[in-house]
Amino acid sequence: MIAPDKVHYHVPEMRRIKNIHFVGIGGAGMGGIAEVLLNEGYQVSGSDRQANGMTDRLSGLGATIFFGHQASNVEKANVVVVSSAIDPTNPEVNAANEMRIPVIRRAEMLAELMRFRHGIAIAGTHGKTTTTSLIATIFAQAELDPTFVIGGLLNSAGTNARLGSSQYLIAEADESDASFVHLQPMVSVVTNIEPDHMETYQGDFQKMQDTYIDFLHNLPFYGLAVLCIDDPVITQLLPRIKRKYLTYGYSEVADVRATHVKHTFNQSEFTLKRKDHQDIQVVVNAPGKHNVLNALAAIAVATDENIEDAAITAALANFSGIGRRFEMLGEFATGEGDVLLVDDYGHHPTEVEATIAVARNNWPDRRLVMAYQPHRYSRTRDLYEDFVRVLSQVDVLLLLDVYSAGEEKIEGADSKSLCRSMRQRGQLEPIYVADKNELPKLLADNLKDQDILLTQGAGNIGQIAKELQEMKLDKGALRTGWSK
C-alpha cells in the first residue's frame, strides 16, 4: 500500500494560475493530469462530448464538468489545456485565443508538473501503460509514495492518477502528437519504436526516430535512458544517444536481462540477471513475453533508484493489473455452455498479436472468438497488411467498423476492405458487423461452449465489453439486444 512521507514534497505553485480548464477532460491522459491538479488545490473545469467514468470521478473530486463545447466554458480559466484530439477550431479554443488565455497541449502541463520533481517518463509504441504502472507499483511498495499519471486504471490504486507526497512523478510520454519532447524528466524509458501515428510525422519513420532522440536528449547530462535492446530500431539508434543509458531485454548483451523464462496461467517467471547484482527469481503477475520486457524496464528504473530487491519482487508478484489490459471480465453460463469474456485495449498489430499469444498460452484447447474494432483509418491504412495477417490468427472474427477518432474515412482502409483481404488470404471467414447493435445477435449465433470471447480495440469497444458483461453473455439476452 502507498504510505505518505511524513513531510510532503513541496512543489512551487504556477504563478497567476488558479483556474485550469481541460478541453476533452474525459480522456485518461487529460483526466489524470486534472486529478493531480485538483489534489494540488487548483480549481479545475473541463468539457467533453458526454459523461464517462473519468468525468464522473473528477466531478466527485470537485471539478466543474461541461458537456458539449461552448465559448462560455472558458470564461473563468487562466489556462486552457487541450488534447491532441481537439480541433483547432473548437469554440473553447477560439474563445481562449480571443481572450488571450494561454492554450497549451496536455504534455506542456505534464511538463510543468514534472519540472520541480524527479520525473520518470515512459515512451514507446507499446507497453507504456503497463510499464508505467509497474514502476509506480514498485515505488509504492518501497514506500516512496510517487505521483503518477497513467493511461489506464491502475487496479491497486483504483485510479489512473494520484498526487503523492514524494519528489517522484511517474508518467507516460505520448509520442502520438510528438508532444513528449516538452518533457524534461530525470529518467526516460523507451520500450520500442514502431510505425504508428505516422500522420504526426508526415509518414516519415526516420522523422519519428529523430523525435525519439530529441526526447532522450531532453534528459540532463546526469539523467538516465532505459532502453529495450531487443527492439531493432532502438539498437540502431544507440550510437546517436548522447546520454547515459541502461539496456534491458532477453538479449545476452542487455544490462538487465531475463533468462529461464516460464509462462504459466496469467503469470511469468524468470531469472533476473544484472551487472554487479546477484541473480534472483522474479514472478510477474502479468502474462506474456511482452510483460516480461515491461517488468525488466521497471526493474531497471527501480535498481537505478536503489530500491531493494525485496520491494521489487513483492510489487511484481502482487501486481493487480490495469483496466482493459487483458482484463478478464468473467466466465458466464450462456445457456449453451460457458464462455470467458476478456477485454483488451491493444489496437496495433503487434499488441493484438501479443494478446492472441497470451490467450493461446492460457487456454490452448479453447476456441478464440474476437470482436475487433479498428482504431483510426490512418492506422488501418498504414498497417493494413499486418492487420490482415494478425487478425487471421483467431478462430472466429467479428469485425466492427473503424472507430474514426475524428478522422475522415480513407478509401480502402475500412473494415469491409479488411474482411475482403482476409477472405482472400483463406485462413478464416470474417464476419463484418455493419452496426454495433447487431453484435449481440451475431455473438449469440456464433459462440459455443468453452469459447474465449476477446473484445479488442481502443475505441468504444471497451464500453461494449462492459455491456456484454452486464448481459452475462446469456444467449436470450444477446438475441434481445443491448439493454441501453
UniProtKB/Swiss-Prot annotation:
It catalyses: UDP-N-acetyl-alpha-D-muramate + L-alanine + ATP = UDP-N-acetyl-alpha-D-muramoyl-L-alanine + ADP + phosphate + H(+). Pathway: Cell wall biogenesis; peptidoglycan biosynthesis. The keyword Cytoplasm applies. One of its GO terms (biological process) is cell wall organization. GO terms for molecular function: ATP binding; UDP-N-acetylmuramate-L-alanine ligase activity. InterPro entries: Mur-like_cat_sf, Mur_ligase_C, Mur_ligase_C_dom_sf, Mur_ligase_cen, Mur_ligase_N, MurCDEF_pg_biosynth, UDP-N-AcMur_Ala_ligase_MurC. Pfam families: Mur_ligase, Mur_ligase_C, Mur_ligase_M. It is found in: Cytoplasm. ATP binds at residues 124-130. Gene3D superfamilies: Mur ligase, C-terminal domain (3.90.190.20), Mur-like, catalytic domain (3.40.1190.10), NAD(P)-binding Rossmann-like Domain (3.40.50.720). Keywords: ATP-binding, Cell cycle, Cell division, Cell shape, Cell wall biogenesis/degradation, Cytoplasm, Ligase, Nucleotide-binding, Peptidoglycan synthesis. This is UDP-N-acetylmuramate--L-alanine ligase. It comes from Pseudoalteromonas atlantica (strain T6c / ATCC BAA-1087). The lineage of its organism: Bacteria, Pseudomonadati, Pseudomonadota, Gammaproteobacteria, Alteromonadales.
